[in-house]
Structures are given as C-alpha cells and as structure tokens.
Curated annotation (Swiss-Prot):
UniProt lineage: Eukaryota, Metazoa, Chordata, Craniata, Vertebrata
Stretches the record annotates as Disordered: 224-319
Family designation: Belongs to the Deltex family.
Catalytic activity: S-ubiquitinyl-[E2 ubiquitin-conjugating enzyme]-L-cysteine + [acceptor protein]-L-lysine = [E2 ubiquitin-conjugating enzyme]-L-cysteine + N(6)-ubiquitinyl-[acceptor protein]-L-lysine
Known role: Regulator of Notch signaling, a signaling pathway involved in cell-cell communications that regulates a broad spectrum of cell-fate determinations. Probably acts both as a positive and negative regulator of Notch, depending on the developmental and cell context. Functions as a ubiquitin ligase protein in vivo, mediating ubiquitination and promoting degradation of MEKK1, suggesting that it may regulate the Notch pathway via some ubiquitin ligase activity.
Protein name per its UniProtKB record: E3 ubiquitin-protein ligase DTX1
Domain note: The WWE domains are thought to mediate some protein-protein interaction, and are frequently found in ubiquitin ligases.
Stretches assigned to the WWE domain: 13-93, 94-170
Coiled coil ranges: none
One GO MF term: ubiquitin protein ligase activity
Amino acid sequence: MSRPGVLLPVNGHNFGSQGGPPRVVVWEWLNEHGRWRPYTATVCHHIENALREDGRGRVALGQVDAQLTPYVIDLQTMHQYRQDTGTIRPVRRNFFEPSSAPGKGIVWEWENDAGSWTPYDTEICIAIQNAYEKHHPYLDLTTLGFCYLVHFHSMCQVNRQTHRKRRLRRRMDLAYPLTMGSIPKSQSWPVGSGSGLPCSCPQCLLVNSTRAASNAILASQRIKVPSGPPPALPPPPPPPIHPSGLRQSNTYSGGAAGWGRTGEGMRSTGGIRNGSGFSRSQSVPGAAPYPGQNNLNRPGEQRTSGSSSRASIPPGVPALPVKNLNGSGPVHPALAGMTGILMCAAGLPVCLTRAPKPILHPPPVSKEDIKPVSGVSGICRKTKKKHLKKSKNPEEVVRRYIQKVKSPPDEDCTICMERLVTASGYDGVLSHRGIRAELVGKLGKCNHMYHVLCPVAMYNNGNKDGSLQCPTCKAIYGEKTGTQPPGKMEFHVIPHSLPGFSDCKTIRIVYDIPSGMQGPEHPNPGKKFTARGFPRHCYLPDNDKGRKVLRLLLAAWERRLIFAIGTSSTTGESNTVVWNEIHHKTEFGSNLTGHGYPDPNYLDNVLTELHRQGVMEERSLPY
C-alpha cells in the first residue's frame, strides 16, 4: 500500500529526480501515542510548494489553515514546532500509489463522542478504500492491529469486544500532491548533519523498534476479507469492578477509531517515562490478538512476589509486568500489551510478572485532620463564567507592545517565514486596519522583530485578552489569561507524607469542573463539552517551595490557565476539559505512571512552567 517511513533526507539532499514512477505525497506528524497522523491535502500541497522553493527552509502552516497559525515545520530537522507552547513533534514525508485513496482525494472518517468526524490514519484509510472498491461487505481490521469490523452496508464500525458501533463516512476532498522520480532511502526522521545515522534518542528507538516488529507481524499476516458474513463477535466483557471512591481512568481502546473511552478495548499497561521529570502517562496501544499468537509463556511459578519472583526468571530473559495476572492457564496476548506481542512475534522469551499497582490516593483522612495551608487564606477558590469585555482591537494591542523599525535586517520573520524586507506572508490572508504589509516592528522587552501584521494574526487566533506572547522567547506582554471553564479549586493539608518528603505533611488540591456549554472564547461556541475524571486530586509537599507553588497555582486558576477545552491526548476525545501545559502530580504514594513522587525536579519544573505562562511570585495574587 505504501512505503512506510519514507522521509526527507537531511541538509537539502535531492528529493527525487525525474524519470521514476509518480507517487502521492502525504505529510504526517507523530502524536504522543506513536501514531503518524496525516495533514490535510491542502496543507500537504502547501508544504510541497515550499519544499520546491527551499528544501532547507521553514513552512508556516497558518498561511493555508487559520487553525494551524501557531505551527511551523522546519524542513531541515523535519520537526513541527508550535510557537505558542514550544511543543516539538517529528514529521515525515510518506509516499503512496496514485491509485490509492490519497491520490483520489478520498477520505474515510469515523464519528467521535462529540459528534464530529475524525479521519483514519492514512494506511487504514487505504485499506478501507481498497475493500470498498472490491465490493467486500465488510473489512476486519484485526491484522492491522485493531479489534474492529468495518461494515460497508450500514457504514459503521463495530468494536469486536464491546460491540459498540460508530458511524463512518466516505467523502471526497482535494487529492494529495503528486511527485515524480525515485523515492529517497527510508530512514527515521533526520538528525544530525549528513551523518546518515539513525537517531538514538529514546523516542526514536521506541518508534523504530515498534515499526520493525509491527512490519514483521504484518508480513506474516494477510488481510483476509471473505465474501460471506463477518465472523461472530465475542460476548461483551463483564463491567469492571472498581474500589469505592476511585474513579475509573481513561485508557486506549486499541481501535482504528482512535482513543476510545474506558471499556471499549484493551487496558493500558503503564506509562512511558521521558526522563524529563514530566513524563506524561501514556497508555500503550493494545493491539487485537492475532491468530495463533495467544500462547505466551504460562506464568507458572513466576507468580510470586519480591526476590523469589525475580530469582525464578532465567538470566537474560526480560520480565514483562502484566496487570490482570490472576488465576492459572494461558494469558491472552492483549493483557501483555504491545510490548509482549512484539516480543512474542520476534520469538524472544518473556516471563510474565505481576505488575505493581500505583498508589493514587492517601489513607482515609477525617475532617478533623484536614487543616488549612499556612500562609494561604481560605480553602477554596471558584471561577465563574467569563464576562466578556468589549473586544480589544488587535491592531491597538499589538501597537501597545511593539515599536516601529525603520530599517529592518534582511532576515526571516519567524511567524510567516518571509523576509523582513518583504511583505508579510499574511498580506491578503488577514483583513487589517491601516497596517502596511511591509511594516516591521520589534517587541519592547525582548527586541525580537516581526512584520507588524504577523503578531496581529497571532492575536486574532488567540484568547484576545489584551496580552501578547513573543513566539521566539515566550516573553509575555500584559497579563495572559486562559479559557478554562467554570469550576472549583479546593486545597488543604492532610497528615500524610509524600515519598521523598518525609519531613513534612502534604497539600492536597482538588479540582472539580462540571460539563457544560462552550462559550465564545472556546473552540466550538454553543457546543457541549465534557469533563472526564473530575474531581481530580493533586499533591504538593507542605514545605516552603510547595506552598509557593500552591500560591502560583491559585493565581493561574484565577487567570483560567490550569485547564482548557480541547482534545484529550489520552482518549482522543474532542470538546473535553484537558490539562493546559502546567503539570500536576496525581499519584500520591508511588511514581509508576510518571505523575507521582518521588520526583526531585518536579517543584522546580512546575515553577518554570508557571513562569512561561506569565505567573510569577511578584505578579501573583496576594493569597
């Protein structure tokens, strides 16, 4: 179907000479779950045009899609950079046959929980279109690693484990761009300067090993689409039982429909640490079982604890923690997560061990033992609906913080990527009042220079709160506020200690935000939003630095910066309340998910994150 992993070479090497067969080009970005997600055909045409002009330059995506205004692609390093948050993600240039779905402009999409449509990954879209063109009644996605059946007659997708149905649709769009010539040698995303060596960072190693093992599985399996009725679905699993007082967390569904709700598929098998002190808990994608691959090693005598368990594992054989390791008999491959499946596919020995359980909550605390935080008044803060003031004129806001430059240097504007001595890339794209497209200015504190029209475009795409943030150094001009929906923040001291802070008690923060209707400052005004997992409990040590963090978190809460409405990186659900770039510790007595203690760098790191949001000690509210 495609040439997976075919990417741009480093340092502007040739992207293909004339004479080879034509190929369809699809640009993709790597999300936090290790899945490559396609850009739209319009964006891909824009990137290809920029590539022909300068194969080592940068591409501002906001020039063709206003929703992508903060995003820039660096063709030299093959990364996508988000200017307002500093988030960096790898990108790649993938190739497909002209007769495939991208070449025809065909997009297959599934309906998410919010009622909006999400496109399938490119290769899944191609597989669905191929089956559709051959008039197959359905397509089983099991051999692609997803426990779903796609029914073409009813145009729905069925989860083989839970029987849940989702609507799907086929629509026509702009065809993806064509390129002629030889395809560059496959490699991971470019690193270094012409070294030709694969990247050795943990993320690259993880993705490359996963890709290699997945290709080995798919090479031994062929998608079989019989003409008869689909195979019988297994009975739905019994509802999980959860301890009282604990809320069920969201996990990856393991399906082509993205990241579903809890109970729709495989369970997660833990978090992936990123070594930065802010490791985001990521559910490992649970692939559906493959025929003949459910003969994992029996746990046998490995089901013991402590040193006896480790002693029974042969030397050199990795131990694979499994959550649902109870009783006797063979263990279903899905329980071992993607890691177990890949190791079994490679023929490596695996010993299953019982996975440790995170300690999410402290022991029960009576009301008499709960005390206020020293030096902080009250125990609760509430935010209400934002009362929208008269919208400030974007041109006036930008002029307040920017100074005119009469003779700009001949260098790039890092917002539109055009030269400062030429007109802004947003000339003709943005309606503006009395600002010449060639006018250049510099910000007062940091002296970074841009076309004046470019910060106006960024302000128009933001919260319009009268503040401005430099996309280069992140310096904030004015007081930045967010779009956090109404809710309540409680805080108090409990008589228990966090791991690594045995000399003090613990500050517990409880956030509670109800579901509601989106306002004019939100992504989809007038549409409902969900609030999953609330109330959320977070923990800080009750010492000087912990209390300082609490005071700044209170200021961030008042400015509506803690949460936002967006798409969950855990479940893929859109129009839901998500964390907003300020990390919290939600695991009380352990650090198995990366969201707990001990973590000696956490307090310093969260202070840095608050500073980036413009929340600093001297500017915080007097609590």
